[in-house]
């Protein structure tokens, strides 16, 4: 099963995370299928960058979000509808 979860990067005591699509049974920092965003908790407030269309694509294919990623998803504003 695919999961959308955080993968830790950064130096000791200076965490920076990638939001990745990865098999559920892989290691936290293991090989991922796709990187769909980043999260830096050290800024005030924490900076979140998400490729919303890619996250929606993977969720439609059956990927599940971790609890933390769900909270980050709720914090990010939806992209405004393009005027065409």
Curated annotation (Swiss-Prot):
Keyword Ribosomal protein (UniProt): yes
Molecular functions per Gene Ontology: structural constituent of ribosome
Membrane-traversing stretches: none
One Pfam family of this chain: Ribosomal_S16
KW Ribosomal protein (keyword) present: yes
This protein's UniProt keywords: Ribonucleoprotein, Ribosomal protein
Domain of life (superkingdom): Bacteria
InterPro entries to which the protein is assigned, alphabetical: Ribosomal_bS16, Ribosomal_bS16_CS, Ribosomal_bS16_dom_sf
GO biological process, alphabetically ordered: translation
Protein family: Belongs to the bacterial ribosomal protein bS16 family.
Name of the protein this chain belongs to: Small ribosomal subunit protein bS16
Organism: Koribacter versatilis (strain Ellin345)
Gene behind the chain: rpsP
């Amino acid at each position: 099963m695919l999961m959308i979860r955080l993968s830790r990067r950064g130096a000791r005591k200076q965490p920076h995370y990638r939001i990745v699509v990865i098999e559920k049974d892989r290691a936290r920092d293991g090989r991922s299928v796709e990187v769909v965003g980043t999260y830096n908790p050290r800024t005030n407030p924490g900076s979140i960058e998400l490729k919303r269309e890619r996250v929606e694509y993977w969720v439609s294919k059956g990927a599940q979000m971790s609890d933390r990623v769900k909270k980050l998803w709720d914090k990010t504003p939806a992209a405004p509808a393009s005027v065409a």
